[in-house]
């Protein structure tokens, strides 16, 4: 299992992100300003996008696990990775919720 940052061609991963947020224009917005990570275990199993919200707050804008791989700990692994990676930079890790109907 490997977690890596995605710096280019982020939209190639949009299908999985759309599972967690149906508004593609919102995804486009936070992909531009956010940092994206994918978790690979043979292939992409999960992904997330985080943004710096200021005042020591890091927000998870989107986190999605491939439906066939849910319940296998991939989402937890991403959360644990983020908490560890950003522990010294941020005092709060929060999950944003969408305003989609």
What does each model-found stretch correspond to?
Residues 33-35:
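Short loop/turn microsegments at loop-to-beta-strand junctions
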Residues 1-26:
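Short amphipathic alpha-helix that is part of the acyltransferase structural core
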Residues 27-31:
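Short loop/turn motifs at secondary-structure junctions and domain boundaries
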Residues 65, 71-84:
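Conserved acetyl-CoA-binding loop-helix of GNAT-fold acetyltransferases
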Residues 38, 43-52, 56-64:
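Conserved beta-strand in the GNAT
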Residues 86-98:
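Conserved GNAT acetyl-CoA-binding A-motif
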């Amino acid at each position: 299992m490997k977690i890596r940052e995605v710096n280019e061609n982020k939209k190639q991963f949009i299908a999985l992100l759309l599972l967690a947020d149906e508004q593609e224009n919102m995804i486009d917005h936070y992909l531009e300003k956010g940092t994206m990570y994918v978790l690979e275990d043979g292939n992409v199993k999960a992904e997330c996008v985080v943004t710096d919200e200021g005042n020591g707050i890091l927000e998870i804008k989107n986190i999605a696990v491939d439906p066939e791989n849910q319940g296998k700990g991939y989402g937890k692994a991403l959360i644990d990775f983020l908490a560890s990676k950003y522990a010294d930079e941020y005092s709060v890790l929060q999950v944003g919720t969408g305003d989609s109907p």
